[in-house]
């Protein structure tokens, strides 16, 4: 008799030996068999999300079949089912396989090439701290690194400043070079592409420019929103994209917003940017922030107890960059005071932190509250569906301010306003943006509200 539980343990032991800890946790930790049909040999397996399902089907199912045949002489038929009980299935994905052992020769070649690419050596998958806000992006990035040009192409990672988009993007480059040291990887800021293009025209070196960008195996473009309103650049990048995509070369882009939100981005680029997968990174939750601080402290050789890490993490809920900045501030304060780092010292060091933080990420509820009080309505009305002017105008202003004062994407803002579509938020933003220039009453209200929210 085929014992599913024992076989699954056997298969997991095989995979644990093959993959490193990061990889194993990515695809096996939250995956389990839920049903086996002894007549058809169909094995139903529960996975966490669409990315995990796609990766198992493409990369792991054959290994599962081979393992079952070797274990029990049975040719199983794996069927993968997404866990519908997952609270946020679209966000729960973890990284994927990296082989633990690499030849020293490959490592040397990797390091030499990486230096020329200007990739940050710290930006690897092993150094990436995962949480609820970035699991899907991390899993997608790992899937791309494992099967470039075929899994999600292009991969479009979007989200606010300092949340780890560049880290994930460069980690893809690091992994490709670790596995294929001779691969041609090009990592650039979008401004670099613009400057290179302009210089190629000026110096009549367009052929060299196109050779650089159209013959690579992996193109990583950071902050693609910089292409907004640049028609000539968009035209050139379109042809670069077409060439790489048709040659099945991987393209990865980051942005602070969705392709549809980038102003004056050509329709054909918007279309192509959405061919693959678009994944959002959101601000880290408390547990993730503590994990980030703990890893940072260990890297710096700092001894900080859990209570102090918890306190620092509770003071910064915006992004990783500001979170690590808070730790640096605490460290500097401890050095100046010649004191050990503890909760009291951290409290003194960060006493003015809240005064200088910008309104971002998770503060849409505050904006709704201030706007509701200003217009003598309720947050429930702002989130509701009433179309009377007394509600519609405050709602649109609240959406406008949410877009202006936070790093939240349009879909996220729509979600905070009763699950409205992102196009509704876009319409509200555009309308208020225009009215500010022509309607003194609206302009005055927006100005007053900004002052109230920011102070």
UniProtKB/Swiss-Prot annotation:
GO terms for cellular component: cytoplasm; plasma membrane. The keyword Transmembrane does not apply. SUPFAM superfamilies: P-loop containing nucleoside triphosphate hydrolases, TrpR-like. ATP binds at residues 162, 164-166. One of its GO terms (molecular function) is lipid binding. Residues 335-455 are annotated as: Domain IV, binds dsDNA. Residues 118-334 are annotated as: Domain III, AAA+ region. InterPro entries: AAA+_ATPase, Chromosome_initiator_DnaA, Chromosome_initiator_DnaA-like, Chromosome_initiator_DnaA_CS, DnaA_C, DnaA_dom, DnaA_N_sf, P-loop_NTPase. Gene3D superfamilies: 1.10.1750.10, 1.10.8.60, 3.30.300.180, P-loop containing nucleotide triphosphate hydrolases. Residues 1-74 are annotated as: Domain I, interacts with DnaA modulators. It is found in: Cytoplasm. Oligomerizes as a right-handed, spiral filament on DNA at oriC. Plays an essential role in the initiation and regulation of chromosomal replication. ATP-DnaA binds to the origin of replication (oriC) to initiate formation of the DNA replication initiation complex once per cell cycle. Binds the DnaA box (a 9 base pair repeat at the origin) and separates the double-stranded (ds)DNA. Forms a right-handed helical filament on oriC DNA; dsDNA binds to the exterior of the filament while single-stranded (ss)DNA is stabiized in the filament's interior. This is Chromosomal replication initiator protein DnaA. It comes from Lactobacillus helveticus (strain DPC 4571).
């Amino acid at each position: 008799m085929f014992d599913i539980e024992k076989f699954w343990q056997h298969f997991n032991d095989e995979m644990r030996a093959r993959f490193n800890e990061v990889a194993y946790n990515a695809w096996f930790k939250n995956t389990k068999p839920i049903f086996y049909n002894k007549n058809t040999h169909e094995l139903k397996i529960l996975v966490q999300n669409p990315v995990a399902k796609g990766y198992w089907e493409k990369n792991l199912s054959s290994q599962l079949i081979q393992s079952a045949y070797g274990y029990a002489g049975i040719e199983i038929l794996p069927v993968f089912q997404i866990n519908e009980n997952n609270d946020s299935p679209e966000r729960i994905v973890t990284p994927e396989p990296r082989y633990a052992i690499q030849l020293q020769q490959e490592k040397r070649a990797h390091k030499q090439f990486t230096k020329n690419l200007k990739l940050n050596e710290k930006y690897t998958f092993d150094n990436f701290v995962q949480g609820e806000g970035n699991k899907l992006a991390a899993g997608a990035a790992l899937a791309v690194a494992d099967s470039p040009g075929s899994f999600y192409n292009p991969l479009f990672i979007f989200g606010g400043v300092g949340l780890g988009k560049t880290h994930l993007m460069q980690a893809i480059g690091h992994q490709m070079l670790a596995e294929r040291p001779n691969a041609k990887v090009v990592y650039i800021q979008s401004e670099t592409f613009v400057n290179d293009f302009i210089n190629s025209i000026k110096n009549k070196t367009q052929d060299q420019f196109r050779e650089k960008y159209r013959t690579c195996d992996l193109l990583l473009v950071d902050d693609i929103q910089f292409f907004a309103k640049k028609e000539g650049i968009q035209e050139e990048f379109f042809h670069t994209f077409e060439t790489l995509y048709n040659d099945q070369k991987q393209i990865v882009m980051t942005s602070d917003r969705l392709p549809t939100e980038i102003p004056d981005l050509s329709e054909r680029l918007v279309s192509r940017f959405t061919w693959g997968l678009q994944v959002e990174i959101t601000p880290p939750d408390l547990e993730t922030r503590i994990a980030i601080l703990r890893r940072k402290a260990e890297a710096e050789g700092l001894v900080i107890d859990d209570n102090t890490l918890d306190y620092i993490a509770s003071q910064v809920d915006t992004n990783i960059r500001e979170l690590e900045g808070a730790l640096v501030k605490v460290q500097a304060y401890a050095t100046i005071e010649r004191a050990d780092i503890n909760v009291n010292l951290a409290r003194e060091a960060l006493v003015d932190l809240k005064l200088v933080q910008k309104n971002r990420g998770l503060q849409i509820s505050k904006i709704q509250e201030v706007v509701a009080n200003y217009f003598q309505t309720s947050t429930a009305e702002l989130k509701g569906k009433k179309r009377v002017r007394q509600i519609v105008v405050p709602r649109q202003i609240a959406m406008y301010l949410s877009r202006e004062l936070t790093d939240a994407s349009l879909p996220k803002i729509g979600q905070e306003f009763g699950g409205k579509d992102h196009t509704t938020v876009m319409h509200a933003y555009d309308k208020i943006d225009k009215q500010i220039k022509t309607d003194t009453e609206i302009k005055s209200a927006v100005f007053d509200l900004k002052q109230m929210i920011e102070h």
